[in-house]
Structures are given as C-alpha cells and as structure tokens.
C-alpha cells in the first residue's frame, strides 16, 4: 500500500516557461507527470530523461485535441490533476483576418480544455472526495478586458466561466479552479524600457517568477474545500 505509485499530473503546454517549471516541480517531488508540447524544445528531452511522459500535440483542431486525449487514456488508468496551461496570444492586427484570430483563440483556450475535461473525466473520478483537480490558467484581462487583444481576452473569459460550470459538474470528487495571472516573468528579449513600464502597472512592481504560480498550484491541490474560484496573481494591478 505504501509503495503505490501516485497518479500522474497532466500539464498542457509543459515545454517552456511556467508549464516547464511546474513539470520540474512535480518531478522533483517524485510525482509522475504527463506533458503536452507543440514544439520540441531541448527542455523536452530533459523532462523525458527525468521520467516524464511527453506527448506532442496539435491543439489547433478538435481532432488533434481528441488524438491527444486518446494517448492519455492509453497511458494511464487515472489522473491526479489536469493543469490547462497551453496558451496562445494573438492581437487584432491590420490585415489579420479577424475571424481567424477569434477562432484560434477560442480553439486553444476554450475548445481544448472543454474537450479534454470531458474526454478525461473518468480518469479524474473514483479516487475519493476532493481527490482530483482541474486548474485552468486564465488571465488578468478577464476582469479588465483588452482593446488590443479582444479575442484573447474573450477566450480567457470563456475559460474562466467554464471553471464554475465544471466545478458544479464534477464536485465533490474533483475540484475545479482557475489562476488569473498578469506579469509573472519576462521574455529574454524584453528590453529595459518595456520591463520598467510593465513593472509600473502593478502595486508590487516586480515580476515574481514561476514560484508564485507553483505555490498557488500547490495550495489548490492540497485544499479539500476550494472549488469554482478564480485566483488572481496580479500584484495589486487591479488597484492601479
């Protein structure tokens, strides 16, 4: 009994940045991990060598989403959690077909988690009261909106709403919550002027890094009561 292997945690978009940090966090805790990735970064090889199951996935179509779900269903009899981290970021730019922008944002942020939650539901159930989790990664703009990323904001708002609907559907076996970050970490190519402008948007004036997200994920996974809630990680930006 004491040597029973823990059920894996599924992380979509686990090949870089926050998804990668979460994958390593769980690996270091001897927690099995399944990671989806779109592009094969060198970091994927490191995860594989550390024992993670890494599955290349194309979430740009529903068929691609379901093909990934089938691979997960073949590989495990249960899941400890699903962390919906896969994301894309498109602006309404001159010349960009608006219908395509909206369709792309809805596909990755709405269709993908919606289909995966349904397809993998049976892997989350049957493990006890509040024993499994779904965490959706939304965005600070859900509250505020965005004049330059309207489709992106709308798709993340839909994902935020799905958090409450799936919480109602899956309780009490599965807790469903969302995390709504603003600036967490910079890209390597961000220049000093941009970084300062971005930092000034929050009261805390810092980019906290992946650990802030990891700590919140750990809290949600260990809670036996919290469900159907969105947790902002915005450094007080809503008060600016």
UniProtKB/Swiss-Prot annotation:
Annotated GO biological process: one-carbon metabolic process
InterPro entries for the chain: NAD(P)-bd_dom_sf, Sc_DH/Rdtase_CS, SDR_fam
EC number: 1.5.1.50, 1.5.1.3
Presence of keyword NADP: yes
Entries under SUPFAM superfamilies matching the protein: NAD(P)-binding Rossmann-fold domains
Catalytic function, reaction form: (6S)-5,6,7,8-tetrahydrofolate + NADP(+) = 7,8-dihydrofolate + NADPH + H(+); 7,8-dihydromonapterin + NADPH + H(+) = 5,6,7,8-tetrahydromonapterin + NADP(+)
Active site: 152
Keywords, sorted A to Z: NADP, One-carbon metabolism, Oxidoreductase
PROSITE patterns: ADH_SHORT
GO MF entry, a single one: dihydrofolate reductase activity
Pfam family, one: adh_short_C2
Protein family according to the UniProt entry: Belongs to the short-chain dehydrogenases/reductases (SDR) family. FolM subfamily.
Purpose of the protein: Catalyzes the reduction of dihydromonapterin to tetrahydromonapterin. Also has lower activity with dihydrofolate.
Family matches, as PANTHER family: DIHYDROMONAPTERIN REDUCTASE, OXIDOREDUCTASE, SHORT-CHAIN DEHYDROGENASE/REDUCTASE FAMILY (AFU_ORTHOLOGUE AFUA_5G02870)
Protein name per its UniProtKB record: Dihydromonapterin reductase
Organism: Escherichia coli O139:H28 (strain E24377A / ETEC)
Gene name linked to the record: folM
